[in-house]
Structure formats: C-alpha cells, structure tokens
Amino acid sequence: MSQAYSSSQRVSSYRRTFGGAPGFSLGSPLSSPVFPRAGFGTKGSSSSMTSRVYQVSRTSGGAGGLGSLRSSRLGTTRAPSYGAGELLDFSLADAVNQEFLATRTNEKVELQELNDRFANYIEKVRFLEQQNAALAAEVNRLKGREPTRVAELYEEEMRELRRQVEVLTNQRARVDVERDNLIDDLQRLKAKLQEEIQLREEAENNLAAFRADVDAATLARIDLERRIESLNEEIAFLKKVHEEEIRELQAQLQEQQVQVEMDMSKPDLTAALRDIRAQYETIAAKNISEAEEWYKSKVSDLTQAANKNNDALRQAKQEMMEYRHQIQSYTCEIDALKGTNDSLMRQMRELEDRFASEANGYQDNIARLEEEIRHLKDEMARHLREYQDLLNVKMALDVEIATYRKLLEGEESRINLPIQTFSALNFRETSPEQRGSEVHTKKTVMIKTIETRDGEVVSEATQQQHEVL
C-alpha cells in the first residue's frame, strides 16, 4: 500500500513539476515496452519488468499527425493530473531521473534484442522476397513461353496428323475404287469366260457332228470307190465279153463267108454283120460313155462333198485352235488379274494395318501431349497457389513491418522526448498546435487474390488497405 502511495506521490510530484507529456503518460516509469512478436522465437527477459500495452489510434485532424501513444499499467489506476503551474521538487526529480536511467538501460537491452529479431525478420523477408521473385519469374516464364510453345507444337502435330489421315483416307478410297473396278473387270471376264466356254462346247458339239458327217462321207466315198471299182471290173468284163462276142461273130462271119464262097447260092451277110457290129459298137460306146459320165458325176459329187467336209473340218479345227488360244489368253488374264487382286488386297491390308498402327501411335502421342499439358497446368496452378500464398505472407509481413515501424517510431518519440526535456530542463508543455504539425505518411497496400482451378483463373479480387505511418 505504501509503495503504491509513494509511486502515486512520485507521479503526482512529477506531473506537478513537468506536467503531462504531449503524446504519452508516465503512469509506469519503470516498465519496459514489450512488442508483439509474430513469426519469431520468444526470448526471456527480466522478471522485474512489467508488461505495457500500446494502443495506436489514428487521428483525422487537420495536419494528420501521428496517433497518440498511450501507455497504461496493467492493474493500476492513473493518478489524477494536475496543472502545469506547480512548484519544482529537485530531490524528487533526481530520484525520478535515476529510475528513468535504469529504465532507459533496460529498454536499450530490449531494443537491442528487438533489433536483432527485427534484423532476422528482415533477412527472412528478403529471403522470402527472393523466393517470391524467383517463383514469379518461373510463373511468368511458364505462362509466357512453355504453354504457348506446347500448344503450338500440339496444334502443329495435330495438323500434321490430320493431313496424314486425309492422305491415307484418300489413298484408301482410291484403292477401294481400284478394287471395285478390278472386281467389275473380274466379273466381266468371268461372264466372258462362261460365254467362251459355251461357245467352245458348241464348237466341240459341231465338231463332233462334223466328224460324224465326215465319217459318213468317208464311208460313202469308200462305197463309191468300191462301186467304181466294181463298175470298172464290170466294164472290163463287158469289154471282154463284147470282144469275145465280136471274135465269135467274126469267126462265124468268116465261116459263113467261107460257106458263102463255097456255096455261091447263099446270100451275102457281110453288110448285115457290119451293121450289127456297128450297132453293137455304138451301143457299147454309149454304155461306156454313160457309165463314165455317171462315174465322173458321182466322183465329182463325192469329191465336192469331201472337199466341203474337209473345208468344214479345217474351219472347225481353226476355230477350235482360235478358241483354245482365246481360252488360254483369258486364263492367263484371269490368273494375272487374280494375282493383281491378291497383291492389291494384301497392300490394302498392309495399309490398313499401318494406318491403324500409326493412328494408335498418334493417339498415344495425343494422350502424352494432353498429359503433359495437364501436368504443366497443374504445375502452373501449383506455382500460382505458391505465389499467392507467398504474396499473402508478404502482405501480412508488410502489415506487421508497418506495425513494428509505427511502434518503434512511437517508442523512439516517447524515449527521445523525456531526454530532451531533462537535458534542456524545458518544463514547458508542448502545445496541441505543435503536436498537430507533425508530418504523417500514408501507405496504401493492395492485396490481389486470384483463385485458380485446374490451371485456369476462376475468380480475381483486389483489396486495398490504407495505413498512416
């Protein structure tokens, strides 16, 4: 109780002597400031120091000076302030000065620790800014070159693949047309082959009929030759018989002539025999000429028939040879067309297999490129998220640095003001006009939030914060 009373008495004496401070109150001269620590390790301090809470308030006055820095001791009540026209107590001022020097020493130690922590904090901020700059450069590089280049390569390869697909489609259509044409030619040749086979069968049937006719004509010719031989033999026999009859008649005529000569009374028969001989010779010549003419006519008829049959046989043989040659040529053509068709079908199957394999390869390339694009998009999204996180951390650190700067500037102003007061022994109170003439600094912090999904920007928001330093 006595200590609280003495402290209150000292404060009252000090206020009676110096008056209230313009920007702060000395409710606890022995206390030391404790700054809020964010992101640093906590270091132990002396147990005799009490905590001091600082409240920074912005003023919207005409000059816009620094906010008043108020300090209040926890668990104590402020002593009532008195006017500035009271008398000076030098013994109390010396005691207060000694206590203030001790407090000043402790505050220097704490300020050194805070400076070390602040230096570490600045180093960490610089390191994070370097990482942020590197990540931003990487993001810009990926955003500016890699996706565009990958897209160009993808589009170029897709155009090449489409062109190859069109070429292969045209080749396949042309091969299909050629195959259809060859199938039509093959069907036409098969129909022509069937017609030629029918013509060959008809020719063979005609040839068989002609062979029967030739055989019949040959038999007729042989029969006629035999008849001619028999007629010739008959003619020769008749000639012999006629000659014998003539000889007999001549012999008889000679005998009769002898008898006539011997018997003069008998009539003359020479003229009669001559007439008979002439008649027989005429009849024989007529028969011979008729037989020869009939034989010649028959022989000529048979010869003509044989010639006709031979001509027909020769023509049939020629036609058969021609048909055989045509059949052989058509067979060779069919074999060649079959070979061409087989080769074209094999080429078509090879083209289809190659087209299928190339299409599979192109599909694999497309899938690989799409996977690379997705991977790059994921990487870009990850870098954007990291960049956004680092940007948020940087903004928070900037805000915290600004807060530390304001607290340090307020503490320096609070510390420097009593020193100037004690050194100059200037017991005049600072007027409100002088406090309002201090220059303030206004800082604007822009926080830009970008939300991405699968590498694409979904939403973008911008927030501005105004701070007065």
From Swiss-Prot:
Residues 141-150 are annotated as: Linker 1. Residues 295-411 are annotated as: Coil 2B. The record marks D353 as: Stutter. Residues 151-251 are annotated as: Coil 1B. Pfam families: Filament, Filament_head. Residues 109-140 are annotated as: Coil 1A. GO terms for biological process: intermediate filament organization; muscle organ development; nuclear envelope organization. It is found in: Cytoplasm, Myofibril, Sarcomere, Z line; Cytoplasm; Cell membrane, Sarcolemma; Nucleus. Keywords: ADP-ribosylation, Cell membrane, Coiled coil, Cytoplasm, Intermediate filament, Membrane, Methylation, Muscle protein, Nucleus, Phosphoprotein, Ubl conjugation. Residues 252-267 are annotated as: Linker 12. The modification Asymmetric dimethylarginine is found at R37. One of its GO terms (cellular component) is cell tip. Disruption phenotype: Mice hearts have reduced nebulette (NEB) and elevated actin levels, with intact myofibers showing disordered NEB organization. The modification ADP-ribosylarginine is found at R58. GO terms for molecular function: cytoskeletal protein binding; identical protein binding; structural constituent of cytoskeleton. InterPro entries: IF_conserved, IF_rod_dom, Intermed_filament_DNA-bd, Intermediate_filament. ADP-ribosylation prevents ability to form intermediate filaments. Phosphorylation at Ser-7, Ser-28 and Ser-32 by CDK1, phosphorylation at Ser-60 by AURKB and phosphorylation at Thr-76 by ROCK1 contribute to efficient separation of desmin intermediate filaments during mitosis. This is Desmin. It comes from Mus musculus (Mouse).
